[in-house]
Amino acid sequence: MFSQAQFNVTMAEEDRWKQWYPNMEMIVNNKGPKLIFPELNFNITGLEEKSRYVVLLSIEKYDNIRYGYRNGKWGPSKVRHATKKEQEIKYFLHPDGTKLGKELMKETIKFDTVRITNHKKFMDKDNVFFVETMHKYVPVLTVKNITNVESANHSMRMEVAQFFPVTVYNQESIGNWKSKFHKNSTYGNRLDGGNKRKNTDSSEERTSKRSKNETEIAVSDILQVASQSENYNESTNSGRLQNEISSSIHQFPSTSYQNQYPHAYPTVNTPPIYVQQFTALFDEIHNQFDPKTKQNRVAKNVQYLSSVPQFAINQKENIHQNAPDYPVSQFPNQYPYGSYPYYYPYFQSSQQFPHLNYSMNNSIYSDSSFQSSFSAENSYFDENGNPIHYPYYSSN
């Protein structure tokens, strides 16, 4: 047996971690779990050579503080506080399983497949850890002697590897530095297509001033900026949009956004939301429908979005706060302004709105009852429920 003083763990990539200690940042977003870089590779000493061990990794909160990035520095947030809910610790068993102590001490123990996410829907895999943005985390290595079951487990917090999960690098130099060693590390740079929303105390301050309903929809870090695809033609404002969304959905309409993405706006006065964007939003936040059958998708979406007054522009008095689950074909009569004004056209939109380029085949709303409520010539409804057709918005 060995004492705790004999047992020691060091990071194989310690020099890289030290370059940004204690303010390393890791990108997380809604596109899927992200690899941790620098990698979590360890060297262990002080084991019994003939005993067999298992090695486990956990990603745990460093403390119970909610942080903010302000004036170029990380520090405790002055606006929002961490939740009191205790973290559920998850352990990931090293894929090699059990090994002799002498084997473990000769090699570098690599956890290079470990990923992190800020979306619980990706938590079905053993190597994926859930983290919250604006909190600090630290990897913890646990070594268990299974030959001598009475031997105590040995755990060590790797202080040098503490990090902040973020949706975009606050310290852009981190992204530039990572890109030199890891080809997939540039996503979070603002200049490389990353989310333009800063994780700052000042942004939290703006969020805290919103109404309750607005805050529920404008959940931080759940969405990403709608961007044009490689097929976008600037001269004609045409081309397929990627199925992405904006994290600043509560700030629309935005003059700067219109100038940057003129093809994204059929008209200045129309709520700038896309049909497929609604899908991702409610998939992620409310989960109010069966993703396989897609039943009640439209009704549920309308029910939630009808409670958000800023989307209606100057028609707040016409918003229906609790739209029930009526069949979709009844919406024009039952809720002339509480439903369709939030949806952009998809029915024969290749002729009407070529810059959206949605088709019947890829539309989530393809059931006949919903299609029948639209016409090929009119794709929008005014406050009285009358179908109208708005002109395109152009930057010219």
Swiss-Prot record:
Residues 11-192 bind DNA. It holds the Pfam family T-box. Residues 193-215 have a biased composition (Basic and acidic residues). One of its GO terms (biological process) is regulation of transcription by RNA polymerase II. GO terms for molecular function: DNA-binding transcription factor activity, RNA polymerase II-specific; RNA polymerase II cis-regulatory region sequence-specific DNA binding. Keywords: DNA-binding, Nucleus, Transcription, Transcription regulation. GO terms for cellular component: chromatin; nucleus. It is found in: Nucleus. Residues 185-215 are annotated as: Disordered. PROSITE patterns: TBOX_2, TBOX_3. The keyword DNA-binding applies. This is Putative T-box protein 39. It comes from Caenorhabditis elegans.
